[in-house]
Amino acid sequence: MEPCSCDTFVALPPATIDNRIIFGKNSDRPCDEVQEVVYFPAAVHDNLKEHLKCTYIEIDQVPETYAVVLSRPAWLWGAEMGANEHGVCIGNEAVWGREKVCDEEALLGMDLVRLGLERGDTAEKALNVIVDLLEKYGQGGNCSEGRMVFSYHNSFLIADRNEAWILETAGKYWAAEKVEEGVRNISNQLSIMTKIDREHPDMRNYAKQRGWWDGKKEFDFAATYSYLDTAKMMISPGRYCEGYKLLNKHKGNITFETMVEILRDKPSGINMEGEFLTTASMVSILPQDSKLPCIHFFTGTPDPERSVFKPFIFVPNISQLLNTSSPTFELEDSVGKKLQFNSKPDRRHPLYQKHQQALEILDNKTEKAKTMLDNMRKLEKELFKEMESVLQNKHLQVDKIVNLLHQCTEDEIRIYKSNVSS
């Protein structure tokens, strides 16, 4: 399988305005895969003898987990991207290199995204969670629900209100780069070069043993563990380079609307089309002022150019997000659940179903399609304006916010229904 999925971005002051960190990700996955947006509350786990069931394996539970909102392929336990109640955001990428990908079932990179969010209340603590679990349980297993074998190593972009970390892996070996200002992006290639702020203790020795590094020249993680020529990486016409250019084009004035437009960019390939396409997108505003709420926008539908970014804010007593939650199936409580179905179940959630009907109209590019897209943009613009007001006025109406994402999906579905039935 060729590296052909996902782009994750972060922008920090002074590249942004109003002392905000902006996080964004497109999740590029098989075109027939449904991605859901789900919420899990914080929890206390008294019985630590009871193991936690991830996608393929069981691991030790911890005494406490944080509330999380996740955008995830509906068939698995983990997540492609998400955030927790402490303002930590994580997105992961598939990466390939010289180290062989393990076919044995272990933790998926997507499991590690969720585990980092549930167990880390800062970006660096989430990184610690991921690398500790990587050492203990390893990474591996098929990342596709179908018969296609799709396995890879992972890179992660982890951000909070103060900083971001890039974590890139090759099997159990890893390197991490701290990002405290400016812009950074990751795509489907190793990108940490000589600026290595943390690393696996045996990473360099292993590279020497394999003959990938002579131990004399300056150590470059990407050059050592990757197939790619890192000297060409920043000038090649790939998505990593194009994403870097788009971030730098707006450097100094980046807002969450800027990040939305980057995720919608089709000429660069960041908004992907084809057998692999952008199945869901996320943008988060992480104010450095801890008195302000973090705001997370999700599409829950494919193609961000023809989707609505809808806000979510962590407040007490949030109920499950029914319009973006996929159906569950009887056999899905056991580890290795995907192997128990002879064919793929219908995992389309209510928003996804209506959006698919809307796409049929939008594909025709008629006057009706233009009207519907205009209404979608109008709704989104109103939501953006409302969220900006929350940040500027420093006031939250908790009784309204508790059902914010649900109400937004209701409004979006109403647009689709009115145009599909007319």
Swiss-Prot record:
InterPro entries, A to Z: Peptidase_C69
Keyword Electron transport appears in the UniProt entry: no
Active site: residue positions: 6
Modified residues (Glyoxylic acid (Cys)): 6
Keywords: Pyruvate
GO biological process: detection of temperature stimulus involved in sensory perception of pain; proteolysis
Residue list for modification Pyruvic acid (Cys): 6
Chain positions listed as propeptide in the UniProt record: 1-5
Family classification: Belongs to the peptidase C69 family. Secernin subfamily.
Main function: Plays a role in thermal nociception.
Protein name as annotated: Secernin-3
Lineage: Eukaryota, Metazoa, Chordata, Craniata, Vertebrata
